[in-house]
Swiss-Prot record:
Residues 1-23 form the signal peptide. Glycans are attached at N79. Pfam families: GILT (PF03227). Induction: Up-regulated following injection with the Gram-negative bacterium E.coli. Up-regulation increases between 1 and 12 hours after the injection, then decreases between 12 and 48 hours, and then increases again at 72 hours. It is found in: Secreted. This is GILT-like protein 3. GO terms for cellular component: extracellular region. The keyword Glycoprotein applies. The lineage of its organism: Eukaryota, Metazoa, Ecdysozoa, Arthropoda, Hexapoda.
Length: 216
């Protein structure tokens, strides 16, 4: 009897225990979506503000999306021979490197939905103002500021650069579903993000999301 009880107890634990590493229960089916972008890139700003944000909000897709943001884009690292330190260069100059690093610190120190909403607000203009956006949203960004002030830009951007440079991207923003990078379909994904999201979700989970019937 004790053995039977033990087996039943173990089975129950396996059924209800969260998936390791993500805190989600097994029935929470989320599609992994990675956005590789730049803080001063007009196309990045347009995609995030006009397509990605609206898609997640209007379709109520936050609960089915595992969103990853990589503020690096077509940047790179080099060794400063005079100091011996690793440094970073960015497509739109030094200011973009600093803003990319600030975005990275926001992503590191806030939960992803709060971080995304804050970045969405900042991308209204090229100044990427953190103060007005954080105050209007009532978000504490002290840890993000500390992150930015306590480390070099290259150190902050290193993990984001590592993932982005693996892809060898030629355009920003670049969107990747489930770590499966398709360089030839990027324009279509950018212009028809909702349709591609629906297709990818159906492909992975064999589930057509409620709003996808009108999209596919």
């Amino acid at each position: 009897m004790n053995k039977i009880f033990g087996l039943l107890f173990t089975l129950c634990l396996l059924l209800v225990w969260p998936t390791p590493g993500n805190g989600q229960s097994p029935d929470e089916s989320r599609l992994l979506v990675a956005i590789h972008y730049e803080a001063l890139c007009p196309d990045s700003m347009s995609f995030i503000r006009r397509r990605l944000y609206d898609a997640l909000q209007d379709n109520d897709w936050w609960s089915v999306t595992d969103l990853k943001l990589y503020p690096f884009g077509k940047a790179g690292f080099y060794n400063n021979t005079s100091t011996g330190e690793s440094q970073v260069f960015c497509q739109h100059g030094v200011d973009e490197c600093e803003l990319n690093a600030l975005h990275a610190c926001i992503i590191e120190t806030l939960d992803i939905r709060k971080a995304f909403n804050l970045i969405y607000c900042m991308l209204r203009s090229y100044s990427n103002e953190l103060g007005p956006c954080s105050r209007s949203m009532g978000v504490d960004v002290s840890k993000a500021r500390e992150c930015k002030a306590s480390r070099t830009t290259a150190e902050i951007l290193a993990p984001y650069g590592k993932e982005t440079l693996k892809l060898g991207i030629s355009f920003v923003p670049t969107i990747v579903f489930e770590n499966d990078f398709d360089p030839y379909d990027q324009r279509s994904i950018r212009n028809n993000f909702e349709r591609h999201f629906c297709r990818q979700y159906l492909k992975k989970f064999n589930i057509k999301l409620p709003t996808c019937s009108a999209i596919l």
